[in-house]
Regions:
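C-terminal structural segments of small proteins and small subunits
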Residues: 110-133
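Polybasic, low-complexity binding patches
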Residues: 106-110, 139
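Iron-sulfur (Fe-S) cluster-binding segments and ferredoxin-like electron-carrier domains
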Residues: 95-106
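Alpha-helical scaffold segments that form or flank carboxylate-/histidine-based iron centers
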Residues: 74-83, 112-119
Length: 140
């Protein structure tokens, strides 16, 4: 079992909607590692089935977020807003990670959160809380 530090974090999972206290690693939280590992593992399982429609859809998704008239950072921010309004926690985590990789600032991120709440209404607030938690973990 990997070494853990004493820093607690709430774990929000689509498969475990209740809250649990967990300990995190210093470099990257278990919350982030769990999400990335699960996503990678399941992508491999799905792509190994060699379904042409799924492969084409995922290719289209990758192409859509490439630089074009809009740069990829702007597209990821738009994807994050859409994911928050649609209340897809896994999608939110994915776009938060990409936004972090692309140099999004915390100030920019909270403007995105504000727009998502304006568009989606109060039902987006719980997703904003989880997004803020995940963002804070990315910044560590």
């Amino acid at each position: 079992m990997p070494e853990r530090c004493n820093s607690p974090v709430l774990n929000f999972s689509i498969f475990r909607p209740y809250l649990t206290k967990r300990k995190t690693k210093n470099c990257m939280s278990e919350l982030i590692n769990d999400f990335n590992n699960y996503r990678s593992k399941m992508n491999e399982v799905i792509l190994a089935k060699d379904n042409l429609v799924l492969k084409r859809f995922w290719s289209l998704d990758n192409q859509a977020y490439a630089d074009g008239a809009l740069n990829s950072k702007t597209k990821e921010l738009l994807g994050l807003i859409s994911s928050m309004v649609l209340r897809c926690d896994d999608c939110i985590k994915y776009h938060l990670g990409k936004c972090h990789e692309l140099g999004t600032t915390t100030e920019e991120m909270y403007e995105v959160f504000a727009i998502a709440n304006l568009v989606g209404g109060s039902i987006v607030i719980p997703h904003t809380r989880r997004a803020a938690e995940y963002w804070e973990e990315l910044l560590k």
